[in-house]
Amino acid sequence: MEKLRLCLIFMLLFITSFSSVAHAIETRATHAILIDYETGLVLFEQNPDTLMSPASMSKLMTVLMVLEALDDGRISMSDKFFVSDDAWRRGGSKSGSSTMFLNARSRVSVENLLRGVIIQSGNDACIALAEGLGGSELGFAEMMTERARDLGMENSTFMNSTGWPDVDHKTTARDLAYLTKHLIKHHTSSYGMFAERSFTWNGITQQNRNPLLYANMGADGLKTGHTQESGYGLVASAEQNGRRLILVINGLQSKKERASEARKLMNWGFRAFTNETLATPDNVLVRAPVWQGEFAWVGLAPSKAFRVVLPRTGLRKMVVTASYDKPVLAPITKGVPVGKLRVTLPGLETQEIDLVTTANIEREGMLARALSAISYVIFGE
């Protein structure tokens, strides 16, 4: 380990000037995860990798499949999909489930179906989209599972497009959080639909069920879920002062409890932590010895701006270290990773970034290399 230079120490002294009350947090949710969008750091988790029934939160994967088909040019927002008798029977007004109130054998645009899924949680809209893209809902569900694997959602299996209870239809809070981050990052132009508070179809106006949209806390999505098996769940995201958090909770006992737990966890995440730039590529933090080079030392700096999540209190327990294999063998090319800069804090995952060389250094001449080798054997340096 190498001691960091004074410039980094000064940054830490500046950051430690923050003062607020950070405290432990608990939740009644059986499954929960709260992550920082920018860094991906987990701020809180409870059974995040335990399989659970996601109910209508599954529809986020359905939405992703549609948005990717739009991006690929396979469909357009104005394309009209057929509403089959099966879609109407299992997801329509007579089904007793969440519905967009589509008419059987009608044709509805992809754009309206998307809003029916996102805002109204319409099972009929999901099935119509699934049949239009996958030929059948089961075929579409297989596509959903395959795409989930591509995204690294190793614990997710989808048996339908709606989240209707099925013994094999499972996911985890962590997988849903990763899916949400992907949606926000790669589909910004469509993401605004998740913040729309109501949608009218067939003369019936339905309100968005996401309770955080009405809580004046910067929430702009995403999806609720509820079945008797799963309890009440929510995938939510909110942004305050340029900082975004993603929350997944499930297993609550009521709508009221879901809303209160979501507000509590999201507010805690914004109050208890801050995002800061610890170092930039302009900050040479370490001088590493060079072996058989024309210069004895090479500077090491972060490969890009090192953005970290820091608690607003308790920074005295923070440990910042730089590690690398030394000496660095010449010739050296600028920008090559040779080590890591790490930040360790109690209760949080280690945050790290590559340390890269800041200069090109040629090898020294043959005689000088021989003398360096002798010096290394005798003196170890």
Language-model regions, residue ranges each:
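Domain-terminus/edge residues, biased toward the C-terminal soluble/receptor-binding domains
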Residues: M153-T157, P165-E381
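Intrinsically disordered/low-complexity terminal segments and short unstructured peptides
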Residues: I15, E26-A29, V343
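Generic marker of residues within folded, mature protein domains
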Residues: F14, A22, F44, D71-G73, ...
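Active-site-adjacent loops and short helices of periplasmic peptidoglycan-processing enzymes
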Residues: A22-A177, K181-K185
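Positively charged n-region of N-terminal signal peptides that target proteins for export
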Residues: M1-L6
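Bacterial N-terminal signal peptides
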Residues: C7-S17
